[in-house]
Amino acid sequence: MSAFKKSLLVAGVAMILSNNVFADEGHGIVKFKGEVISAPCSIKPGDEDLTVNLGEVADTVLKSDQKSLAEPFTIHLQDCMLSQGGTTYSKAKVTFTTANTMTGQSDLLKNTKETEIGGATGVGVRILDSQSGEVTLGTPVVITFNNTNSYQELNFKARMESPSKDATPGNVYAQADYKIAYE
């Protein structure tokens, strides 16, 4: 093979390889977020912003029974150090609050989709404790830790309700904030 052909071959291979080096075959950005909190337990990633799917409930159920079946949800605590600095923690106090309650129903979360096109009316969302007792918004629910493990579960439920039995079909969305205190 002549020197010219060898040079041409080397140049061709170099061009092919250089195209792969400079070709953009996909790119993106990875963002990381978190927060350091002063507490004996960490909240499991993803549980700081939960979504509870209450499903599709027939309006006839809400008009007759006034309530849907309750759907469970859990706030998971991890990396718990329940004994530290002479203090032992045996309970979590979870307080739910909201700026939007149904008129005349201070413990029923308002459907904020109610005023939008396609929003259900006459429907709110009720938070329940693990035993299906109604949670009073703004009042702590005390949960005793079941052991001294570093992993704990705070179990609750939620359901749709129509106290006036006049629910209309449509989308339902409600929101509550929660805070955890330890004792």
Swiss-Prot record:
Pfam families per record: Fimbrial
GO process terms (BP): cell adhesion involved in single-species biofilm formation
Gene3D superfamilies in the cross-refs: Fimbrial-type adhesion domain
Keywords: Disulfide bond, Fimbrium, Signal
Main location group: other
Disulphide bridges, residue numbers: 41-80
Entry GO terms, CC: pilus
Compartmental location: Fimbrium
InterPro entries: Adhesion_dom_fimbrial (IPR000259), Adhesion_dom_fimbrial_sf (IPR036937), Adhesion_dom_sf (IPR008966), Bact_Fimbrial_Adh_Pro (IPR050263)
Secretion signal span: 1-23
Keyword Protein transport included in the entry's annotation: no
UniProt similarity note: Belongs to the fimbrial protein family.
Name by which UniProt lists this protein: Uncharacterized fimbrial-like protein YgiL
Source organism of this protein record: Escherichia coli (strain K12)
Gene: ygiL
